[in-house]
Amino acid sequence: MRVLVTGGAGYIGTHTMLEMLAADSTPLAVDNFANSSPVALERVARLSNRKFDHTEASLTDAPAMRQITEDFKPEAVIHFAGLKAVGEFEQNPLTYYEENVSGTIQLLKAMDAVGCKKIVFSSSATVYGEPQYLPYDEVHPLSPVNPYGRTKLFIEEILRDWAATDPQKSVMLLRYFNPVGAHASGEIGEDPCGTPNNLVPFIAQVAVGRRDRLKVFGDDYDTPDGTGIRDYIHVSDLATGHVAALNYTSRHGGVEVVNLGTGRGQSVREVIAAFAKASGRDIPHEIAPRRRADIASFYASTEKAKLLLGWQARLSLDDMCRYVWRWQSQNPEGYEYG
């Protein structure tokens, strides 16, 4: 299957590309490399022992996207591309809406131009907002608490409207929880630009000596140890979930929503302890005030993923931390200097 992968050089994109290549798909990675590196794609090619094409383009560049789809003629799309940093989002929302929402519209127009009717969208559990109950299932009310989550929700609604125009169109909305981990080889992993926004990459940079200490934002939540609880899912499990979703969309029309998580919550303190064990190093940390709009507990119901896709997460928190440490210790400065 010819699959166009937007954001294919990114953290989740590269791991999914590896799984797709192993499944004999023919991917084309499209990335503007604003928050990623071409080196990541070189490593995917080396690890898979497969050649594949990639091109540099922004989704908001309508002529470029039209040309790419006309040349490649994708049978399906996996859509990862988008800006993410929540703090920057709140400072500069229009740029993020343009990149994420307008970029998706241009992508769909380019797909329509060549009759491509299948798309798997990298959505997010942030669309749920504050829990009305736990675990979150796919029918939980939607009320995102930050602009990033709102863009994901807007795109979900756009994709629903797009799918409604043709019964042969198929959309899979994958709402995933907290991706962590790295490839078992240590060759590809999460390489954030600037200060990491996510917990585990920050811990890894502390462990390798790039940063002095970790700030734990709040230890007074209504949780067993007072720190926030999240559903951490290994990126390699997430990648196999995308391949399962791609297979489903190739056989079915309409719109489906599926959570990708482990169904288990882990606290910040538990993650720190697991990473210290994996790395053999202390993780200096200090308690800081809660961040605005942070949620105490956040974890998935995974029943639909099992029933619809035949998929479930298999790797543990210890696996996640061990693979991240392998990646970070082999690539202390990320891709450019690894």
Stretch-by-stretch model annotation:
Residues 1-182:
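N-terminal Rossmann-like NAD(P)+-binding domain of SDR-like oxidoreductases, especially those catalyzing
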Residues 30, 144-151, 192, 196-199, ...:
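The catalytic Tyr-centered alpha-helix of NAD(P)H-dependent dehydrogenases
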Residues 60, 84, 96, 195, ...:
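Glycosyltransferase donor-binding loop in the core domain
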Residues 112, 190-195, 293, 312:
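A general boundary/transition motif marking the beginning of the first structured unit of a protein
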Residues 174, 185, 213-216:
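Oxidoreductase cofactor-interface core, primarily capturing Rossmann-like NAD(P)-dependent enzymes
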Residues 181-183, 220-221:
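Short, basic/glycine-rich phosphate-binding loops at helix/coil junctions
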Residues 184-196, 203-206:
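Hydrophobic, Gly/Ser/Ala-rich alpha-helical and linker tracts in large acyl-processing enzymes
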Residues 199-338:
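C-terminal substrate-binding subdomain of Rossmann-fold SDR/epimerase-dehydratase oxidoreductases
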